């Protein structure tokens, strides 16, 4: 009986430690995005509705270069479908914009983070910089894209111009539905989650020790 009790509590402890790792970003690589799910080697993104709207586009390959298709979607939580699995991914940090022509306007690198655990790790990994390539049509006043279209048209006419550098450096196109995260530091929410799981581990360890002691005393008394 004592043997099975130890196995049971060890299993609980391992499960708790494993659950705690859900909140640990893992290393990995960037992803490619496929809007319609037609390519097996790309990732399909389905967006959950939120109160923040914007124009989003998806990358596709053409003669070795990346271009974009534009589609209006919602911001907020998203669900990444990786292989046969689904993964929630929260975001948002900053973007960089690159003009790619009249019909394929912007290519963007968007920083993000995710709280995920296996089996997703086998199919999708985050890198330490937490970056993923995505596209976005930015606007100066967040209600009209005219301003940025005009700005980038000027940049195209004069590639060496510094027009708009100040705007590009300071522009933040939207706010995440959850609090924005800071890559370099640990957020209060993250600290709180870590404390919660550390406390859980401590409680389980204490419980295992006490239970083992009780079993030992009972076994000793029965002798």
Swiss-Prot record:
* Ranges per topology, Extracellular: 20-197
Give the transmembrane region(s).
Answer: 198-218
Primary location recorded for the protein, binned into one broad class: membrane
- Signal sequence annotation: 1-19
Sites carrying a glycan are 69
Query: What is the topology of this protein in the membrane according to its UniProt annotation?
Result: Single-pass membrane protein
Alphabetically ordered keywords of this record: Glycoprotein, Membrane, Signal, Transmembrane, Transmembrane helix
Cytoplasmic topology: which positions? 219-223
**What GO terms fall under cellular component here?**
membrane
Q: Where in the cell is it found?
A: Membrane
Name used for this protein in its record = 23 kDa piroplasm membrane protein
- Organism, by scientific name, is Theileria buffeli
């Amino acid at each position: 009986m004592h043997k099975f009790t130890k196995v049971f509590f060890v299993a609980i402890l391992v499960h708790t430690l494993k659950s705690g790792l859900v909140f640990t970003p893992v290393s990995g690589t960037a992803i490619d995005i496929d809007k319609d799910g037609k390519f097996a080697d790309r990732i399909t993104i389905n967006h959950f509705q939120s109160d923040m709207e914007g124009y989003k586009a998806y990358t596709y390959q053409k003669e070795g270069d990346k271009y974009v298709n534009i589609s209006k979607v919602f911001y907020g939580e998203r669900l990444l479908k990786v292989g046969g699995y689904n993964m929630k991914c929260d975001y948002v940090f900053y973007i960089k914009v690159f003009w790619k022509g009249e019909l394929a306007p912007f290519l963007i690198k968007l920083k993000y983070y995710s709280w995920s655990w296996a089996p997703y790790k086998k199919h999708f990994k985050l890198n330490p910089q937490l970056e993923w390539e995505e596209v976005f049509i930015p606007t100066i006043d967040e209600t009209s894209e005219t301003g940025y279209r005009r700005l980038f048209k000027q940049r195209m006419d004069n590639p060496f111009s510094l027009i708009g550098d100040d705007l590009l450096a300071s522009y933040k196109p939207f706010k995440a539905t959850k609090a924005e995260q800071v890559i370099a530091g640990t957020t209060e929410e993250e600290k709180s989650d870590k404390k919660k799981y550390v406390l859980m581990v401590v409680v389980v360890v204490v419980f295992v020790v006490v239970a083992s002691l009780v079993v030992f005393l009972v076994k000793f008394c029965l002798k």
